[in-house]
UniProtKB/Swiss-Prot annotation:
It comes from Pyrobaculum aerophilum (strain ATCC 51768 / DSM 7523 / JCM 9630 / CIP 104966 / NBRC 100827 / IM2). GO terms for biological process: SRP-dependent cotranslational protein targeting to membrane. InterPro entries: AAA+_ATPase, P-loop_NTPase, Signal_recog_part_SRP54_M_sf, Signal_recog_particl_SRP54_hlx, Signal_recog_particle_SRP54_M, SRP/SRP_N, SRP54, SRP54_GTPase_dom. It is found in: Cytoplasm. Pfam families: SRP54, SRP54_N, SRP_SPB. Composed of three domains: the N-terminal N domain, which is responsible for interactions with the ribosome, the central G domain, which binds GTP, and the C-terminal M domain, which binds the RNA and the signal sequence of the RNC. This is Signal recognition particle 54 kDa protein. Keywords: Cytoplasm, GTP-binding, Hydrolase, Nucleotide-binding, Ribonucleoprotein, RNA-binding, Signal recognition particle. Its EC number is 3.6.5.4. It is an enzyme of class 3 (hydrolase). Belongs to the GTP-binding SRP family. SRP54 subfamily.
């Protein structure tokens, strides 16, 4: 993935160097995005649609308050890349019956046999009893390769060194492992245009009725991954895909995008030669790594938290400011850090009405306030006026603070509530004009 990270790193350097995004700058950045995607071997039609979507969003969407345009552009780039590679949610591997039969297929040289062992170890580490079956009668070394890998990872193996009928070997192998949780059946590598071999894998499919058919694709084929997937799909259903050799090429991004275009789900990627260098594919995590941004999750949290604060602001503007709303504010503030952030979002610079001393005190006491609010009942959060001395003592005891700490928090809340009244009056005056 290093090569892929490097080419996207150059793109991010250009974006970070932008202070203001006007039409000319946006067009230049869009061309740079296109060049980057083409270097990653993403199919041209996907490059065009990706760029159009990203540019449209930047033009039409307003960044949340406090988020510089360049940061929001990176956020949009992240979201669109995740969509390009299959969506936010990773496709999980979940055996639904026993035994759960997995049929592996792919072209010769794709790393399919090694992948069979990698998948077996991945599942074994998660508590599944796994059996490996080798049906390749064309490549003599396949039998020894998978048997040795099976011994290395401690997984049972079935194969017939001198076997001639792949279909019969598959049937006997499945029968041999009928008490296993998962049976992984490896097949001979085949070219997508070799009709006889494609018919053979269809015959194996019909004979063992696999619960999942997994296509193994070499990342170095880039955008041609779509053609491979579509060729196999003509003969049997492809339920999921594993992309191998992701560590050795920048074209892996193109392979992932091309596969996503076919509708097949990438479930795993191979990121090295060792049997442990194998991981579940998550578009979100993959994009974060490719962009080389250790703080990407922080950036996403920041933007999402600001959106949450804007929802709180809507509640304030509508007059729905109670302690439950205040609690939502505290939750967002714990993500963002400084309390002054929420007041910066208020229109008309209402933050000036809160003293620096109050803000600094609030920053020191955020966690204490969160504990206090968590000690209140829902009725108390929605109806702060019922908080008498007895209730305050109970809340303080539950939060591990003194009653005066509860009263101090209520004072800050009351100040914010009064500000909301001022805000509503200003809004009504504007509407009356």
């Amino acid at each position: 993935m290093k090569a892929l990270t490097e080419i996207f790193g150059k793109l991010l350097e250009k974006i970070r160097g932008v202070d203001y995004i006007d039409e000319a700058t946006l067009q230049e950045l869009s061309r740079e995005i296109q060049r980057t995607l083409l270097k990653a071997d993403v199919p041209l039609d996907l490059v065009k649609s990706f760029t159009e979507n990203a540019v449209k969003r930047i033009k039409e969407e307003k960044p949340p308050a406090g988020i510089p345009p360049r940061e929001y552009l990176i956020y949009v780039l992240y979201e669109e890349l995740v969509k390009l590679l299959g969506g936010e949610q990773p496709a999980e591997f979940k055996p639904t019956k026993k035994p759960y039969i997995v049929l592996l297929l792919g072209v010769e040289g794709s790393g399919k046999t090694t992948t069979a062992a990698k998948l077996a170890k991945y599942l074994a580490k998660r508590g599944y009893k796994v059996g490996l079956v080798e049906t390749d009668t064309i490549r003599p070394a396949a039998f020894d390769q998978l048997r040795q890998l099976a011994e290395k990872i401690g997984v049972p193996f079935y194969g017939e060194r001198d076997g001639k009928d792949a279909v019969e070997i598959a049937k006997r192998g499945v029968q041999n492992f009928k008490n296993m949780d998962v049976i992984i059946v490896d097949t001979a590598g085949r070219h997508r245009n070799e009709e006889a071999l494609l018919k053979e894998v269809r015959a194996i499919y019909d004979a063992v009725s696999p619960d999942e058919v997994v296509l193994v694709i070499d990342a170095t084929v880039g955008k041609m991954a779509a053609a491979q997937a579509e060729a196999f799909m003509k003969y049997l259903p492809i339920h999921s895909v594993i992309i191998t050799k992701m560590d050795s090429t920048a074209r892996g991004g193109g392979a992932l995008a091309a596969v996503a275009k076919t509708g097949a789900k990438v479930k795993f990627i191979g990121v090295g030669e060792d049997v442990d260098e194998f991981e579940q594919f998550s578009p979100r995590k993959f994009v974060a790594r490719v962009l080389g941004m250790g703080d990407l999750d922080t950036l996403l949290e920041k933007i999402k938290a600001v959106f949450e604060e804007e929802e709180v602001l809507e509640e304030i503007e509508s007059g729905r400011l109670d302690l439950l709303t205040f609690k939502k504010q505290i939750d967002s503030l714990l993500k963002l850090g400084p309390l002054s952030k929420v007041f910066q979002l208020l229109p008309g610079n209402l933050a000036a009405k809160i003293s620096e001393e109050q803000i600094e005190l609030s920053q020191r006491n955020l966690k204490k306030w969160r504990a206090i609010l968590s000690s209140m009942t829902l009725e108390e959060l929605k109806n702060p006026e019922i908080l008498n001395a007895s209730r305050i003592r109970r809340i303080a005891l539950g939060a591990g603070v003194a009653p005066k700490d509860v009263k101090e928090m209520l004072t800050v809340y009351e100040n914010l509530r009064k500000m909301s009244k001022t805000l509503r009056r200003q809004l009504r005056l504007r509407m009356a004009k």
